[in-house]
Amino acid sequence: MHRNLLRIPTLLALVLCLLLPALAHANLLAKILAPKPDLWSRWTAHDASSERRIDHSAWDRFLDSYLSEGPDGVVRIAYGSVSRPDRAALRAYIASLAAAPISTYARAEQFAFWVNLYNAQTVSTILEHYPVQSIRDIDISPGLFADGPWGKKLLAIEGESVSLDDIEHRILRPIWQEPRVHYAVNCASIGCPNLLRSAFTAENTERLLTQGAIAYVNHPRGVKIADGALTLSSIYAWFEGDFAAEGGVMAHVRRYADPELATALESIDEASAFEYDWRLNDASSVRG
């Protein structure tokens, strides 16, 4: 979830705050720095009548082999344990997706395609640079103030060079306008919603999106109340506009909150703070 903001160095952020005191509030500054949906209209092409399906079984096998949930409820990947054959299989899976004429598929199949491609490419990129403490340490994006891999054109789809940023902010967010997409794309960080254990498909997308929303909202890294003060994941500040159609972030959070959390939220109108943990979601970090 994750992903191409907060890339401005600390010094520049400090200068911004000094020059623009009204923006010093972290939430307000985050909103301004956050990437907005920017439609790449070339990817709106689809065939509503298509019944073709893409095989994501290779991604399912990878997830089944290397994902584990820690005692803290965070799903991590055993990056250091991924075998050479499985690395090659992951690259082959990504290549198979890149070769698909995705513009000829139906919308539901396209959504699953882009989410799985984003997540698989993110994991593959981590593996290429592992070990790292954070995905932000993979400094391959172009631009003076960029960090992380999100801005680099890592993929070629239907003759177009495509980055992870393109997939999230120019394809998924503007075309589907689905706030739960933030529970689907994974930025390989502890603070991010869990990478789900199953590949997305046209048939299971709705279930997985709801599952992801419930899991994140009801985990402390998504929503946390202490001494009557509400702390939310920075995702809800960065992408606040994506939740507007549901009545805003608070309405969205209440919708997916378990009964106990929902009751606690009744007397709270807004968050007091936002936080995010950019440490890598590496299974080795919780080994005894």
Predicted regions and their residues:
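Sec/Tat signal peptide C-region and signal peptidase I cleavage site
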Residues: 22-26
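N-terminal secretory signal peptides that target proteins for export/translocation
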Residues: 1-5
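Interaction/scaffold regions that mediate signaling and macromolecular assembly across diverse proteins
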Residues: 27-115, 119-288
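Bacterial N-terminal signal peptides
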Residues: 9-21
